[in-house]
Design a protein with these regions (language model features):
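Metabolite-binding pocket within alpha/beta catalytic cores that recognizes anionic/polar moieties
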Residues: 1-85
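Active-site rim beta-loop-alpha module in soluble metabolic enzymes
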Residues: 88-114
Length: 114
């Protein structure tokens, strides 16, 4: 109640950008400028795991990024920064999402790599 929320249409208004066309760094920069400090992202995708079913909610705890054609950092050009990705997700926010999903009796799988 009384919380401000920012919404960003990842694929643009009208869903017009392919994933490879999305300017992720601009999106993150814009959210940061708005004062956003936590992000909840929704995605629909398939899985090779037979124990995941359509409609299941999965709360990731790690990322495997196999993309190669887009910039991976805000740094460079003489600026070297080392940022740990050992725990890329906020544990307290993940726990809130898990509790919310389970309260609806929806199948929820916590701690799954994405």
């Amino acid at each position: 109640v009384g919380k401000k929320v920012a919404f960003l249409a990842r694929h643009g208004i009208g869903h017009v950008y392919m994933p490879s066309e999305v300017n992720y760094r601009a999106n993150i920069f814009a959210l940061k400028k708005l004062g956003v400090n936590r992000i909840v992202s929704i995605s629909a995708c398939g899985s090779l795991r037979e124990d995941f079913h359509p409609g299941d909610i999965v709360i990731p705890n790690q990322v495997v990024d196999l993309t190669h054609r887009r910039p991976r950092t805000f740094f460079g050009e003489g600026i070297v920064v080392h940022i740990s990705v050992a725990e890329p997700f906020c544990e307290s926010l993940s726990n809130l999402l898990i509790d919310a999903a389970r309260s609806t009796k929806q199948t929820c799988t916590p701690a799954a790599p994405m």
